Swiss-Prot record:
GO molecular function, one term: translation release factor activity, codon specific
Post-translational modification N5-methylglutamine, affected residues: 237
Keywords annotated in UniProt: Cytoplasm, Methylation, Protein biosynthesis
InterPro entries noted in UniProt: PCRF, Pep_chain_release_fac_I, Pep_chain_release_fac_I_sf, Prokaryotic/Mito_RF, RF-1
The species this protein was found in: Nitrosococcus oceani (strain ATCC 19707 / BCRC 17464 / JCM 30415 / NCIMB 11848 / C-107)
Keyword Calcium applies: no
Name of a matching Pfam family: PCRF
Residues of the signal peptide: none
Name of the protein described by the UniProt record: Peptide chain release factor 1
Gene3D superfamilies referenced in this protein's UniProt entry, alphabetically: 3.30.160.20, 3.30.70.1660, 6.10.140.1950
Subcellular compartments: Cytoplasm
Family: Belongs to the prokaryotic/mitochondrial release factor family.
Length: 360
């Protein structure tokens, strides 16, 4: 094992010990959101640290067995050689497991998704191909036990879909389909083609993780400047005699809120904080919408035939994924929703790239 990998694992083991101590603290246990976050982090570390402990134990057995090779007892030396072979085999397996466990996880992998299919180059034929792709993804979702819901549909003039959006709900939806984003090209003879010529059309697919609802906003008191001032307007004589009004400036965002409706400074502060939370939450939600829009634009491209990740060639019964140079002569099976034959190699290639980066 490389020193850099061992160092990373030792750091993670220390972090797990820190989490164990934190989760035992009463103030953490009473803060539900923080407790949940730390518990999730602990659960993510557990399989990694468990595997690392097994690796260390196997390494210890290997070292002890090698020491026994110097023993004068020949039977003990034979036994030591057997234990060395077993320990080396186990270490090799655990090393592979650790590398896989250390791969950076995509925080969106567990999310539900929105699938968008948009007809690109090819007019009516592209709209019909969009319908074929939709059927393929719906059948794949059905095979995996996912729930689907049509969110929006713009039908083609002569059948198919100009654009259609589907919400897919189920475990691993994003992790399995995230590599489907891009241009999908079809080569076939349209039904309206009397000369039997092959036409090329294209659709774009975008896979977008569904945004989670924003939890209650956490506000750092250090980010606040609180000013008091004498209230004006309605409220009787009392409002003009004390500095009961509150103005709160959120330094990080520049948002300013104030409240002078109540006679009590405490109540005005509570109302102002409530308004600040609402404004910050609204700002976060607007930011999420903007990010989703940007993601969608980056994924769907222009719909031009040149921006392609995959080609479906009907005359040859062929599907080619150009990113990994994978060609399968299983067009009918794939269009029936048997997508694992393409998705599994894509996932494997992605993991191989991550492992290569991890080993650098």
């Amino acid at each position: 094992m490389k020193d850099s990998i061992r160092s990373k694992l030792e750091t993670l083991a220390e972090r797990q010990q820190e989490l164990t101590a934190l989760l035992a603290e009463p103030e953490i246990a009473s803060a539900q959101k923080k407790f949940r976050e730390l518990s999730q982090e602990y659960a993510q570390l557990e399989p990694v640290i468990g595997c690392f402990r097994d690796f260390e134990q196997a390494q210890s057995v290997l070292n002890e067995s090698k020491a026994l090779l110097q023993d004068q007892d020949p039977e003990l030396r034979v036994l030591a050689q057997e234990e060395i072979a077993a320990a080396e085999k186990k270490l090799e397996r655990l090393d592979r497991e650790l590398h896989t466990l250390l791969l950076p996880s995509d925080p969106n992998d567990k999310r539900n998704i929105f699938l968008e299919i948009r007809a690109g180059t090819g007019g009516d034929e592209a709209a019909l191909f969009a319908s074929d792709l939709l059927r393929m993804y719906l059948r794949y979702a059905e095979q995996r036990g996912w729930r689907t819901e049509i969110m929006g549909d713009s039908p083609g003039e002569h059948g198919g879909h100009k654009e259609i959006i589907v919400r897919i709900v189920g475990a691993g939806a994003y992790s399995r389909l995230k590599f489907e984003s891009g241009g999908h090209r079809v080569q076939r003879v349209p039904q309206t083609e009397s000369q039997g010529r092959i036409h090329t059309s294209a659709c774009t697919v975008a896979i977008m993780p569904e945004a989670e609802e924003i939890d209650d906003i956490d506000i750092n008191p250090a980010d606040l400047r609180v000013d008091t001032f004498r209230a004006s307007g309605a409220g009787g004589q009392h409002v003009n005699k004390t500095d009961s009004a509150i103005r709160i400036t959120h330094l990080a965002s520049g948002i300013v809120v104030e409240c002078q409706d109540e006679r009590s400074q405490h109540k005005n502060r509570a109302r102002a904080m409530s308004l600040l939370r609402t404004k910050l939450k609204s700002e976060e939600e607007a930011k999420l919408v903007a990010e989703e829009t940007a993601t969608r634009r980056s994924l769907i491209g222009s719909g031009d035939r040149s921006e392609r990740i995959r080609t479906y060639n009907f005359p040859q019964g062929r599907v080619t994924d150009h990113r990994i140079n994978l060609t399968l002569y299983k067009l009918d099976e794939i269009l029936q929703g048997n997508l694992d034959a393409i998705i599994d190699p894509l996932v494997a290639e992605h993991q191989a790239d991550q492992l290569a980066a991890l080993s650098d």
